[in-house]
Amino acid sequence: GVMIIGGECFYHCFTRPAESANGNTNCPHCQGKSPSGEVARLVNRVAAAVKKTGTHKALYAWPYSAWIWSSQDPAEVEWVSGLDANVSVMSNFDGYDENVGPGGGVRFFDYNITCIGPSTTFARQAAQCRKMNRPVFSKVETCTTPEAFFLPYLPLPQRWQARLEAMKATGVAGFIGQWRFFGMNASPPEELQYRAIWEKDSGKALETICRRDFLLDTDGVQETLAAWQMLSDAWEYFPYSAMTSGERAGYMRGPFYLGPAHPLIFDVQDSYNLPLSFRLLRGDAKEFASPEEFEELQRKAKPRYVSDLLVTLPFGLERYLELLRQCRSQWQAGRERLRSILSGRGERAERELGIVETIDSHLRTLENVVKFYQARDVLQNTACGSEEFRKRIEVLQKIATDEIANAERMLPVLEADPRIGYGYCYGPVYDAEMVRAKIAQCRFVRDEELP
């Protein structure tokens, strides 16, 4: 079994104590004791009990969000060192370091593919496990990330391959690779995963996929690999943050998540008669609520779209747009190169192009939403004459026109591939009807509200 012993799930006195931000607890018995030592002691007792029910049974302890109680042991090395041999350590491979790349200024949380890994925390835990002659296991994402649950996989094959090679080099004995353990989608990154597990040398896996799925010759294979590399390199500039992933909700909200279904809000007090699908709760809400509570939650649900610029935190508006434009520019170059190779190469090739096109559309929506709200706020908050006022209106209308075109181009993509927007983990993210509703809303803003 797997038990999360950090800040959720398997509760103990240090899980999330009230009014404590530094690892203390309000439990009179545990007050003043070492959180790492006490949590290790509890896990050891559970592991011993598990073994009594069958010596073949294994227990994996996962310190997910343990930063809540590990301020004095930030890499949880003391906790690892206190574990009995009956306990196996499983930890996040890519989390909790500060991004030192182009998108610097944020700390990696949960799962991403910007950081290949291992993180400092995982590397230190792995080193401690080696000292104790114990295996170390990891929890990673191997095909997509939380901000992109609208796709079965992110088409960044070299980044996924580098992650798997890094896991091998770090000595990872095994891993769980899907959010909520949802299973496999038969995606190219998952094939890389299988080959990395079962083949001693999986370095030619991408070439195999190109020849088999796209029926390419040697030159075509090399061109495809080069195009994929451009896409993988573009992701260095993706403005990764909790706000991009889901704004104040943390996950599953905002312009990158909803992409071509995300509206452009001019009047923040107007719901624009958008259908209920724009306010649906995330799919796991039913797991912790009774039917009556769920109905109440749904009635009070906030929109899944956003109407302000909090999404640009902590970068600030100008830096956010700079990163986004760099990411988009490189992505478009890779997309065009891939399109020149794969167009007309069969169903699998067309599906790959559709996935790449979808990311391009979501990045374009993200930029348009940020630019629209920036221009809207200038219009609403800065005095100007009538001529300047008209120019500002025209800027907003131009952005709306571009976003309408962006959404319209996604309709045939959605028609061709039901995986896009499906949301296999938490329920539908968006569909063609939501995109059409968004297009109608943007036309209303452009053609009626702004004039």
Stretch-by-stretch model annotation:
Residues 1-32, 242:
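Active-site groove signature of glycoside hydrolases
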